[in-house]
Structure formats: C-alpha cells, structure tokens
Amino acid sequence: MTHQTMFKRYAIYFVPKGELAKFGRAWLGWDCHKGQYISSENAFSEPLADREYFTKKPRKYGLHATLKAPFRLQTTQNEPALRSAFHGFCNHQKPAASGNLTLSERGGFISLRPQTQSAALFELGKNCLEAFDPFRASLDQNDLNRRRNARLSPRQNDFLHQWGYPYVLQEFQFHITLSSRLSILQREKIIPALKNLLAHELDCPFIIAHLALVGEDRNGQFHILEEANLSG
C-alpha cells in the first residue's frame, strides 16, 4: 500500500513555546504551527526594523533547533510509521536541561545557544539521530556535493556519509538560529537590541521538555506535524 504525502522531507526539531515562540513567529515571519506567513510590518524598530532581510535564510524553518536534520523518507517507510515512531521515542526520553540561553554569533549567524552543551543535551541529540535514521533515505549526489562545498572537516565528512548530516555526535551544537549570515556591523547593531528584547527569556532556565516532528512542503516551508512531551 502506497501512502501519499505532501511533504518532501521530514525532521525532528525543538520548537519553543510561550513568549519565545511568539517572538519567533514575528521575527522570522513564519508560523510553522499554522503554516502561514506572519506580517511583521512596523513590529520592530531600529536597528531591527529590517528583520525581513536579516531573517531570509532561516524563515522557512520557523523558530527551531535541529535534533534530526531534514531527510527524505526511505522508500520502505511511510509517514504514518514515522509519526508513530516519533511518539514512541518521546515517551522514552527524559527532558534535557542545559543552563540559560545566551545570544551567540558564529560564522556570521546569530543564534540562541545554551550556556553549556550539557551531557543530557548531547544524549538527547545522539538518541534522536540514531532512532530516526532507519527512516532516512541516503543522500543523492547533489546533496553530497552541496554539503562538501561547506568545507567540512574529515570527521564532518565522515558523519555526512554515515548519518546524512555533518553536525552530529561530537560535532553537534544545540542552537536556535535567528538570522541569515550578517556583516560584523549588522551583528554589532542587532545583538544588543535582541538581548534587550529577549531579556526575560535569557534570564530563565532552559529545558527541552518537548519535541516536534516537522515536514517540508513542496515550496520549502516547514510545518509542525506532531508535537509530544518528553515523558521518559
């Protein structure tokens, strides 16, 4: 029996809730729960007013952190089985604490990162990577070539071939991307403004207590398909 789907790739994300989620919808301009664009005209003042330009690259994903990078389904797998496996996985995983979030800049991108990449966070990432790999189709040559252009280290290149993504296991760094690649001048203006805007969220303990299964539609936009608490 063939299961038809409107999604070309799937991923496992942490998608924030509450005030951080509200900020993310306005800042990135995409609501991955409702599957719709969000107009943020006049929502941000300088130096954040040009947020549509600042956030062009991460917009289609919605505010998120990646636990299992986007993948195409194996021909022997289907979406209902993936949905079921997602809930089974979450039922056996414990929440992961990792200190407060902090604004960070790496490679020209602004992101939110935990103050410490805790052992619990590493373990959750590893478990997620391994649990859903049986659903992942192998990368085609175009995917491999595109990733190789990112100047991967030998270990990252090995991970790319084994896991379909270079930034896993020892290379895994939990982060919530907030911008496209920006100039030094742009980052110097934006980061202090974002720190002020997100002061409350940065002052609260950060715990990953739920995950989301997301799907990428034919236009490249990501939608939440399932959410579940980590209840192990």
Descriptions of predicted regions:
Residues 2-106, 119, 123-202, 218-232:
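Basic, often amphipathic N-terminal segments
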Residues 204-205, 211-213:
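Interaction-mediating elements
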